[in-house]
A protein has these predicted regions:
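A short, structured active-site edge motif that brings together acidic residues
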Residues: 24-32
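Short, active-site-adjacent cap segments at secondary-structure transitions
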Residues: 3-5, 32-34, 53-54, 184-186
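Glycine-rich phosphate-binding loop of actin/hexokinase-like ATP-binding domains
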Residues: 40-95
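Short strand-loop junctions, especially beta-strand C-caps/beta-turns
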Residues: 2, 68, 180-182
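Acidic-glycine-rich active-site phosphate/pyrophosphate-binding loop
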Residues: 9, 50-63, 132, 187-193
Length: 193
């Protein structure tokens, strides 16, 4: 999607190749989700899928976050990244034990944390977003580490929506908030609080 105004230039070859009319507009997919949930297009949308983004529209302006996991809520990638960081903090004795360690080791095929972290550091091992539903499962089962991570990502999304409402000048008015993406639709009660 279009995250930056300059991204529209990237689509010029597509317009030409598809012989689209010269007035064709490209928008960020978050704006499409906003209109899908709010036919007037007025309101906010919080996307929490593989990545994350918050967008909103008032009657006079449209705004969106960067969609870069910088100072804003991310999606499954951020959840998994925080899980990796938490497991490292357990390894260093900073955090108490959590089932997150065993989950990460099992999913990545490692018997011990030292070998796992060596593979992360030296072999470029990366965790994938496929781990996110399992982190949700651990949180739902009561694992404190997973609860903390899930709550952190969800809280950031809520903060982003509040900031978007303020920037749009909609504070103090009823605002429709659309939630889209796999994390929002997973029915994880802890994330949804």
């Amino acid at each position: 999607g279009i995250d930056w105004e300059s991204d529209t230039e990237l689509f010029a070859p597509t317009i030409s190749a598809l012989a689209l009319p010269t007035g064709t507009s490209f928008i960020n997919d978050s704006i499409a989700a906003l209109f899908a949930g709010s036919p007037s297009g007025i309101g906010c949308v919080s996307i929490a899928g593989t990545g994350g983004k918050t967008s909103g529209r008032s009657s006079t302006k449209t705004l969106q976050t960067m969609g870069m996991d910088l100072g804003e809520g991310g999606g499954a990638g951020q959840l998994v990244s925080l899980a990796l960081d938490y497991v490292a903090r357990i390894y260093h004795g900073i955090e108490p034990a959590s089932s997150l360690t065993q989950l990460v080791l099992t999913e990545c095929g490692y018997a011990d944390a030292t070998s796992f972290f060596q593979a992360v550091a030296r072999d470029g091992l990366r965790l994938t977003e496929d781990l996110a539903p399992k982190i949700f499962d651990l949180a739902t089962a009561g694992d404190a580490g997973a609860i903390g991570i899930v709550t952190a990502v969800a809280s950031q999304h809520a903060t982003d929506v509040i900031a978007m409402i303020d920037q749009l000048g909609l504070a103090g008015t009823p605002v429709q908030v659309i939630r889209a993406g796999g994390l929002h639709t997973a029915a994880c009660e802890i994330f949804d609080q």
